[in-house]
Regions:
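Binuclear metal-dependent hydrolase catalytic cores
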Residues: 1-179, 184-186, 259-289, 297-305
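Cap/insert and terminal regions of metallo-dependent hydrolase folds
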Residues: 162, 171-173, 179-278
């Protein structure tokens, strides 16, 4: 089994941010010597650097779908890495439409890019980024690293994909945004880590009550996202090593704490469980990690098992 590190850079579902609250969705994965970012919601650039990683080390980026809380800061991340000295190409994988996003970004920043090439002698950012649009099936096979995609149920978005990363016997699966979707259990079968989105229904009701478009928002949330107990059901059916709740809805309700998430999930999942929070680090150091249930804290936001 490979050693790996997962850093939850942003754990909030939805694009809005509030004072003192968490950031939208992005995750750093270090696996098989590769530096991988999954989704690029607002705050991803600072999140990567706060995780102790140089932006010059960016290698692979994957976007699960084109909702803004998953893609808004992709361009800024790449541009900032470029100004920080990025000198090697970066591959960006995502659904149909991602290349249009990227071309629009570099067109909007054309003045800055051109003048930095001339004035600072930088390589051309536009030639350093390769955008690869994908559908279901194999996305990448590079040495011992493979990535596959499964189209999930996130209406009205049709191009939304769960991702499975595998390297030398280790498997990490991201649910992406999805309603309860039974085929995801087969896709995540035997994974060491399943990062699955989650909602708490009582929190949704309070969220809806304080928004101007409450009825429409509730309809969208209930049709397009998974309740915490449903995430537990997928984890149980898949037989994963650990369930990590991510993309939390709501993530910034002061009346909801970690115990509420745990209570909801324990109705369907009795295995190892981590409730996501910004900056949390999951580290695997040895070969028996899948069978360990007793993660222990090694810092303010690190969970490590061996």
């Amino acid at each position: 089994m490979s050693k790996y590190r997962i850093v939850l850079l942003g754990t909030k579902g939805g694009p809005a941010i509030r004072p003192g609250g968490p950031w939208p969705t992005s995750t750093l994965v270090e696996l098989g010597g590769r530096t991988i970012v999954v989704d690029c919601g607002l705050g991803v650039t600072r999140g990567v650097t706060d995780a102790g990683l140089s932006l010059k080390a960016l290698d692979l980026i994957f976007i699960t779908h084109l909702h803004s809380d998953h893609v808004l800061e992709l361009g800024a991340l790449l541009h900032t890495a470029w100004t920080a000295g990025l000198a090697t190409p970066v591959k960006v994988f995502g659904p149909a439409g991602l290349n249009r996003y990227w071309q629009g970004f570099v067109q909007a920043l054309e003045f800055d890019i051109e003048i930095r090439i001339i004035d600072e002698g930088r390589p051309d950012l536009r030639e350093m980024v390769e955008v690869v649009e994908f559908g279901e099936g194999e996305v990448l096979r590079d040495g011992d690293l493979s990535v596959t995609a499964l189209r999930v149920d996130h209406p009205p978005v049709t191009e939304c994909f769960a991702l499975r990363f595998e390297h030398q016997g280790t498997a990490i699966v991201f649910s992406a945004d999805t309603a309860f979707f039974p085929p995801l259990a087969d896709f995540a079968r035997g994974a060491d880590i399943l990062l699955h989105e989650a909602m708490l229904e009582e929190g949704v009701e309070r969220l809806v009550a304080r928004t101007g478009n409450g009825a429409r928002l509730r309809e969208h949330l209930m049709a397009s996202h998974s309740l915490a107990g449903e995430a537990g059901t997928i984890a149980a059916r898949a037989g994963v090593g650990r369930l990590v709740l991510n993309h939390l809805i709501p993530a910034d309700d002061p009346e909801i704490g970690e115990a509420d998430w745990v209570e909801a999930v324990r109705k369907t999942w009795n295995g190892p469980l981590t409730i996501g929070r910004d900056g949390l680090v999951v580290v695997v150091e040895g070969d028996d990690a899948r069978n360990r249930e007793d993660l222990h804290e090694t810092g303010d936001a690190e969970e490590r098992f061996a």
